[in-house]
């Protein structure tokens, strides 16, 4: 008799059937991943791969996980955000016999405990690959090894409430795990593929400092990720999150978007399409000029604070909305973030104020003067905390890139092809990902003749643009 599978932590395993139905629907909208299964499945390029995955545990991620396993991988999974898990998706993955540790609304203590559990491989041993979103799994190993090697001073100097919890976990691991625990993990990891802007920044910082432990592929800067997921995904999911959280009428409202990168561009478009009058703040003169040329009013946060009804941060930086900005806002202004971390808004400065929870991930905070502010998802990702994130179709492009990156690092890293540096996928694969999604939406591609291809110096089948081309 087969032992019952128990290597998971989910809210309710009874939600698995519901999750499976939604996974089936999502598969129809994710042609890139399904085509990847069909092309690579017989070759099993990930056979022997043990992938530690830290990425929002959504229905779309479930399709990614099952693509990785269809290609031969063994997987353990956690969410990379305490509010982004879809509990029925996690239940479906657990019911399929895949270890997953994720609950929507989990505590930060549980979040880091689950991350640690992800590295304790079933049957012994360690993972040999990481699939990351935001870099927390990568940082867990890097900082754990640093402390294991004797540099522990940083553990007593946390820079945030979350680091207090994270560093306490590392201290616990150093005390309880056998000597050399982190060194063994670090030795076995062949590479990491990173999903998002914030995690990519961390990787480049480590590369610059010479501390990166293994090769990394920057999935975020694949064109079919950043120019689609970051832009078109946010264009659909931002307003979805705000509406589900507040039921507010967007038309006629004044909205302020901090940051006009790809995420900011999508966010501003989302609000404009909903009928809001949109202002933008920027530090980069190029992005500021782009915003102005798109017809947005470019102002500072100080200008916008007393005027706007809705505030959205999309910068990847810290302290974008300060306590002073919040004090200057209108009564019941709506404040949210669509960047990866929660430090774009000074949430810590609000902890001593009066909080009233309206419903999950919606809080009303009252200032001493009686003014109130509506905060969504406690400053974490509003589109995943208050809604269900990006639609399946756009995530198919991102996750096809992730799958190809895992294959590159695990199966194609021959003769030291990938060193301890950060790479991007080649243009040919970027174009392949795009091509896989065309038929689903009825796109008919024009084909170059040989003489036309020769004239512009490309191959008939592509790639069609130089690496330096900006889409």
Curated annotation (Swiss-Prot):
Q: What class of enzyme is it?
A: hydrolase
For this record, an example GO cellular component is: cytosol
Q: For binding substrate, which residues are annotated in this chain's numbering?
A: 58, 133, 195, 225, 229
Location in the cell reads: Cytoplasm
Alphabetical keyword list: Cytoplasm, Hydrolase, NAD, One-carbon metabolism
Picking any one GO biological process from the record gives: one-carbon metabolic process
Annotated EC: 3.13.2.1
Q: Name one GO molecular function term.
A: adenosylhomocysteinase activity
Which residues bind NAD(+) per the record? 196-198, 230, 259-264, 282, 317, 338-340, 383
What pathway does the UniProt record associate with this protein? Answer: Amino-acid biosynthesis; L-homocysteine biosynthesis; L-homocysteine from S-adenosyl-L-homocysteine: step 1/1
* Keyword match Cytoplasm: yes
InterPro entries linked: Adenosylhomocyst_ase-like_sf (IPR042172), Adenosylhomocysteinase-like (IPR000043), Ado_hCys_hydrolase_NAD-bd (IPR015878), NAD(P)-bd_dom_sf (IPR036291), S-Ado-L-homoCys_hydrolase_CS (IPR020082)
Catalyses which reaction?
S-adenosyl-L-homocysteine + H2O = L-homocysteine + adenosine
- Cofactor dependence: NAD(+)
Cystine pairings recorded for this chain: none
Q: What is its main location?
A: cytoplasm
Q: Which free-text remark accompanies the cofactor?
A: Binds 1 NAD(+) per subunit.
Q: Give the record's family classification.
A: Belongs to the adenosylhomocysteinase family.
Its protein name is: Adenosylhomocysteinase
- State which gene encodes it: ahcY
